[in-house]
Regions:
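N-terminal domain-onset segments
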Residues: 1-85, 94-95, 207-209, 218-230
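A generic structural signal for solvent-exposed, polar alpha-helical segments
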Residues: 40, 49, 81, 89, ...
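Interaction-surface and assembly-scaffold signal
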Residues: 6-24, 117-230
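Aromatic- and glycine-enriched beta-alpha-beta binding-site module
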Residues: 71-145
Length: 230
């Protein structure tokens, strides 16, 4: 994907890029794979009909939506440096396996915005962040017409985790491509209080309230090049 195509990456209205952001974008970004280290607060909620509506039609038609995953992430080490991120992903059961698709993602790094859109067709937009993804702390993100915040309360000791997940995104050339994310780290089980405000549909599917989740103290993951999915 070229830099001229980044605006064609589909997402929810909160992921749209305004003229000022488009004018400030770098022409390129480091290619996949990206090897990253991060800390995060994540939460899981039941998928509503609005979650299916948030997906690109080709991904929506590929399976049954089963859950929504939200996250506030602080990237400590990436090919474009450190940055913060908020995201909403929808899990879809496709041919007996779950895969996630991301209709909403925002960062405070122009280089990450371009890299996400060019390498994985992730609809990254620009946001401002406060706080940290840690137990007892509130991390907030705000963009044009929207705001998301998450406050986590942990219980129990940290648990080592090693996970693999499939990311499926529709690309502007009409192809659904997948990447398999490999990660390992440690997490504390948590309850996460989420607030979502938007002039658009974001709160209809990335729902506010108290959700089951986790605080990830530090994790490393590899996100490889996207390839045409099954």
């Amino acid at each position: 994907m070229t830099s001229m195509d980044v605006r064609a990456v589909p997402g929810v209205p909160e992921s749209e890029l305004d003229a000022a952001t488009l004018a400030a974008l770098p022409d390129s970004a480091p290619p996949a794979p990206w090897d990253c280290a991060c800390s995060a607060v994540v939460w899981v909620a039941r998928a509503t009909p609005a979650a299916a509506d948030a997906l690109h039609p080709d991904i929506r038609a590929s399976g049954r939506t089963v859950a929504v995953v939200g996250a506030m992430v602080r990237y400590l080490d990436t090919p474009v440096g450190s940055y913060d991120e908020v995201l909403g992903a929808v899990a879809v059961l496709h041919r007996g396996r779950a895969r996630g698709s991301v209709p909403f993602m925002a960062v405070d790094s122009l280089a990450s915005l371009v890299g996400g859109r060019m390498n994985w067709s992730l609809p990254k937009s620009l946001a401002e962040f406060t706080g940290a993804p840690a137990a007892g702390s509130t991390m907030s993100a705000s963009g044009a017409g929207w705001r998301v915040s998450a406050t986590a309360r942990t219980g129990g000791p940290a648990v080592p985790v090693k996970l693999a997940g499939r990311l499926a995104q529709w690309w502007p050339d009409g192809i659904v491509r997948e990447s398999v994310l490999q990660s390992k780290g440690s997490m504390h089980p948590a309850l996460v209080r989420v607030e979502v405000e938007s002039t658009g549909p974001l709160a209809d599917w990335l729902r506010p309230g108290l959700h089951v989740g986790a605080v990830i103290e530090r994790a490393k993951f590899l996100l490889p090049e996207a390839t045409e999915g099954a």
